[in-house]
Amino acid sequence: MTTARTVLTIAALTLQEASRRRVLLALVALTVVLIALSAWGFSRVAAESGDATLTSGEARLTASILLNLVMFGFSLIAALGTAFLAGPTLSGETESGIALSVLARPIRRSALLLGKWLGLVAFGSGFVVVAGLAQCLVVWATVDYWPPQPAAALALLAGQTTVLLTLALLLSTAVSPMASGVVAVGLFGTTWIAGVVGGIGGSLGNEAVERVGTVSRMLLPTDGLWRGAMHGFQDPSALVQFGGADSEAFPFLSAAPLTPGYLLWAVAWVVMVGGLAVTSFQRKDL
């Protein structure tokens, strides 16, 4: 069996295994609840707009901000799901001896790790795209608002999920399954908070505080990709009504799209951390 076929086979098995775990039921339940609550909330926005309590511009602005808020909820659900799937998938099999029995066959450790990574990426990205598209349809049906760049925004959310699960996979080669998930989600939350702090610093003209967000987005690109996704979901008029660049102080608006250089850095980050995961797994005593 060629290496490429081995990787694809392991990816398919990983995807099948992930679909049978209880965490999938939790993800589906949380997603359904969030979509239902958001549908009710957006219907209220539509009702207020119909009663002339809100102008059409205010309704679009409100829908834009609420959509970013709900999408952050989806990204958090995806972060929790993928982080706690990545740990048991690798370190759990290592502790139980399953990995040793698989690697006893002519299968390289790098192929095993890459296959599991590919399967988890397909799972996490698929969840984000399906849930995000469903949410966009809910918003369109209730308040007649469609994001300006939904495909690019959903792709960036899938990229955010890929970054986080790559980190979780690296951690799972060194620590226990639970610890790897906790650390990955903790870093995800810390980076988001640092991004909010940096945005506030930028709106106040404080370069030192603004640098906190800039550095955090370079160390872990999840918040940078999230802000790029927000820019694709939000209505362009939202920036004008919130004062242009000063909108960075608001956690659910993004002042500018991502640069090609940052996207290249995010790809390079995944490659580097993935390489570290392969190196760590190859040296791990099974």
Model regions and ranges:
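Transmembrane alpha-helical segments in integral membrane proteins
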Residues: 75-94, 267-283
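Hydrophobic/aromatic residues in alpha-helical transmembrane segments
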Residues: 79-86, 99, 134, 167, ...
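Aromatic- and glycine-rich beta-strand/loop motifs that create alpha-glucan
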Residues: 1-28
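Helix-capping/transition residues at the boundaries of transmembrane alpha-helices
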Residues: 17, 91, 102-104, 172, ...
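Secretory targeting signals
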Residues: 35-87, 113-181, 213-216
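Membrane-interface capping segments at transmembrane-helix boundaries
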Residues: 21, 43, 276-286
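Terminal transmembrane helical anchor/hairpin motif
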Residues: 41-61, 65, 184, 188-276
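Helix-loop-helix units of permease transmembrane domains in multi-pass membrane transporters
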Residues: 11, 85-121
